[in-house]
């Protein structure tokens, strides 16, 4: 099989996967550090943020199919992108551990169904050979997951962790805008 460039639809879906998985990786790797060193919470409270994020991801993934059937893919990605933006805003704007933990829960709820939907959409794309769309989107998504945490670390070291997480916020906003262009 020869190399195939992504078409417009796969580029949009792949970019959304990149942003969502970069956000997942950043929250998984940096939320405890953020709570401990930026918000200045104690060692017993700091890991609760990651637990809240993970719990919301789990709940969302188990319940996502019902929402998907009710709202459709495009609307669900749009709403969940908005949730991810709102949750990260809560996390970054309010210096309270419990508000940050709530924000991380909202981010997890927002990101929870995006990856399953974009993988499904890519796998069912008829304009590319079987499996090629899924391979493209998965590659872009995992590039975000692997690329994100070290970039956040670099930005945190050179600026601050709050500034570094603003980079994730910019990607979440871009994901929200791109989700409006998904073809149904």
Regions from the language model: what does each represent?
Residues 7-23, 105-109:
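Pair of pore-lining "gating" transmembrane helices in MFS-fold secondary transporters
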Residues 43-51, 131-135:
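Small-residue hotspots at the loop-to-helix junctions and early N-terminal turns
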Residues 87, 98-106:
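Paired small-residue
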């Amino acid at each position: 099989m020869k190399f195939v460039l992504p078409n417009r639809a796969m580029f949009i879906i792949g970019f959304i996967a990149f942003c969502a998985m970069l956000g997942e990786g950043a929250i998984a790797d940096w939320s405890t550090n953020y709570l401990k060193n930026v918000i200045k919470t104690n060692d017993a409270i700091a890991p609760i943020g990651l637990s809240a994020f993970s719990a919301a991801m789990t709940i969302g993934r188990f319940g996502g199919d019902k929402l998907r059937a009710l709202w459709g893919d495009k609307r669900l990605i749009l709403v969940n992108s908005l949730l991810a933006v709102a949750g990260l805003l809560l996390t970054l704007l309010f210096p309270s551990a419990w508000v940050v933990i709530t924000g991380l829960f909202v981010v997890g709820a927002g990101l929870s169904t995006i990856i399953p939907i974009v993988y499904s959409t890519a796998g069912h794309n008829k304009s590319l050979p079987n499996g090629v769309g899924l391979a493209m989107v998965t590659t872009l998504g995992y590039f975000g997951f692997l690329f994100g945490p070290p970039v956040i670390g670099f930005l945190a070291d050179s600026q601050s962790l709050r500034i570094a997480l603003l980079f994730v916020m910019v990607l979440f906003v871009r994901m929200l805008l791109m989700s409006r262009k998904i073809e149904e």
